[in-house]
Amino acid sequence: CIRQNFFPGSERMFMEICNNVLGKDFYESEHHTTCGGIAYHCDTIPQETAMTIVARQFALMTEAGYENYVASCITSFGNYTEILETWHEFPELEAKIREMLWKSCRKEFKKPKYLAHSSDLIFKFRNEIAEKAKFHLVNKETGEPLRVVEHIGCHYSKMFPSKGVGGAEYPYVLTGM
C-alpha cells in the first residue's frame, strides 16, 4: 500500500527483472493483499489482526507450492520479520493465529523457510543484473558512475539488524552495487 503509491510500477518491475531478465521462479498471487502493517503501527488494528493477515499471505505462498517469501515493501518486511520472531518466542500466539485463520477463511500455512526483502535479492543478483543491463547509471558526459544517496527504511535494518545486508549502521544494499 505504501510502496505501490510512492513508487508506482516498482513491484511490477521487480517481478519483470526476476522472472524475465534473470529467469527466476517468482510468483505473485492476484489474491495477495496489503500486510496491514501501517494500520498495525498506527494502532488502528490489533496485533492479532495483522498477524492473521500475514498468516493468510503465507497460506497463499503455501498453496502455490512455494517455501520462500519476498516482501517488496519495507513495512511489510519489518512486519513479517517481527511476526515470525514473535511466533518463535510465543508459539501459543502462533497457534491462536492459525486457529483464527482457519475459522476466518479455512486456510493453513507453513512459515517461510526464508524471508527476504526485494532489495536483498536485487543485491544478491547485482552482477547478473549488471551484465544484462541495457542502461548503466553513469554520467553521460564522463562515463563515471553516478553518486547516489541510499536511504534504507528503519523497518528494513534497525528493528532486526541481522536480517538486512550490512545491518543498521552500515547498510550495503545500494552501496554494494
Tell where the protein language model's regions lie, with residue ranges.
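Iron-sulfur cluster-binding electron-transfer modules in prokaryotic oxidoreductases
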Residues: 1-177
